[in-house]
């Protein structure tokens, strides 16, 4: 039987890595807000909303217009699009009564003071106690709980306290 477990580690990024993390937080917020605005405009014009697939395809076009989006982890941008799609899915299910639990409001724009975090995939724990995070390389971390052998890291959330 497979189990999902969560582990929380504190990381100690270098100055360079801190700058890249800040850029990633900002780019994730930009993608979320850009496509939230796009979805709202489509809703007002009674057009079909963009699927997660359509948004991910369009992120490539957006990267061609805004070259600095290429500096950050592309998976983080895709996860932002996925978060928006899930938020809309939960909202529409809530409105139609198909969602269990409390009613959910429509997705809201994120601001600079919102929780700064992003999700990514492809993270590894190295033997020397560092975390291998995409675009950040090896980041110093306090690995106080070892990850069991034969287990895989499905996704990782990086957040600023």
Predicted regions and their residues:
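Nucleic-acid substrate recognition interfaces
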Residues: 1-161
């Amino acid at each position: 039987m497979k189990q999902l477990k969560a582990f929380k580690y504190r990381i100690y990024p270098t100055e360079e890595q801190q700058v890249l993390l800040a850029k990633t937080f900002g780019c994730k917020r930009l993608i979320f807000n850009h496509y939230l605005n796009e979805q709202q405009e489509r809703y007002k014009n009674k057009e079909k909303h963009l699927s997660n697939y359509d948004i991910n395809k369009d992120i490539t076009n957006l990267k061609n217009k805004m070259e600095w989006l290429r500096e950050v982890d592309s998976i983080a941008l895709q996860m932002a699009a996925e978060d928006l799609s899930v938020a809309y899915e939960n909202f529409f299910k809530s409105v139609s009564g198909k969602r269990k639990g409390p009613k959910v409001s429509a997705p809201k724009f994120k601001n600079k003071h919102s929780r700064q975090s992003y999700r990514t995939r492809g993270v590894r724990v190295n033997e020397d106690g560092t975390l291998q995070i995409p675009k950040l390389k090896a980041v110093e971390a306090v690995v106080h709980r070892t990850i069991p052998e034969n287990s895989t890291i499905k996704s990782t959330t990086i957040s600023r306290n």
